């Protein structure tokens, strides 16, 4: 039998299909202005016995499709535990929220903290800052690694930070140096979340921002040890949902 998990995120939708608890298919698309239409396209031709949804759009998905839902916290804990069984702390930074999750020795959630009230420290923040500097998201992390000076960014508010970036550019500061400062400000915020949930190694980094090489390098410095990133860090929630769909049916 095949089971599926779908993560309806603010920016992207991920689908994972399992057979005998092995990943047989991964699909991804943009959420767009109509995430349910996008989800329908993503599911076209996919065979499964049951599907479980997670992410911010999970309850809407449940209204349109025969499914059940699971919180992102639970889904990420299960997905990360499947990929790296020894993981004890998870950091997820997505398009519009970020979360830190502490697990016990059995992989159960014991504490978590979530920022979903503003864009500060999220993928949306980085996207806006990258645009302000004339970079796309892929360039933003790569170019920041080439910086020669670390510039302090005083505000994490997206509106004020964008204004600050504009001022720094007008003052003649190098774009790479500004990019490094912005990436570091995100890591500083994330490290604070990790510490508040009682940071314990090993640490697993998930979500779209985990593809940013500069963020990963700075996070390892902040944690003081290696962090683990899966080759497709955005599919962890969908994987967890698929595993739970199989477990509960």
What are these regions (language model features)?
Residues 3-41, 109-117:
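Short glycine-rich, Thr/Ser-proximal phosphate-binding strand/loop in the N-terminal lobe
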Residues 19, 25-31, 43-74, 101, ...:
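Short beta-strand-loop/turn "lid" adjacent to the catalytic site in phosphate-handling enzymes
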Residues 57, 194, 199-222, 234:
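Glycine-rich phosphate-binding loops at beta-strand->alpha-helix junctions
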Residues 69-73, 220-239:
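Conserved phosphate-binding/catalytic loops in two-lobed NTP-binding clefts
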Residues 71-132, 229:
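Glycine-rich phosphate-binding loop of actin/hexokinase-like ATP-binding domains
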Residues 120, 127, 131, 136-171:
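Conserved ATP-utilizing enzyme core subdomain
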Residues 123-127, 230-249:
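Glycine-rich phosphate-binding/hydrolytic loop that grips phosphoryl groups
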Residues 161-195, 234:
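Adenine-nucleotide phosphate-binding core of ATP-dependent small-molecule kinases
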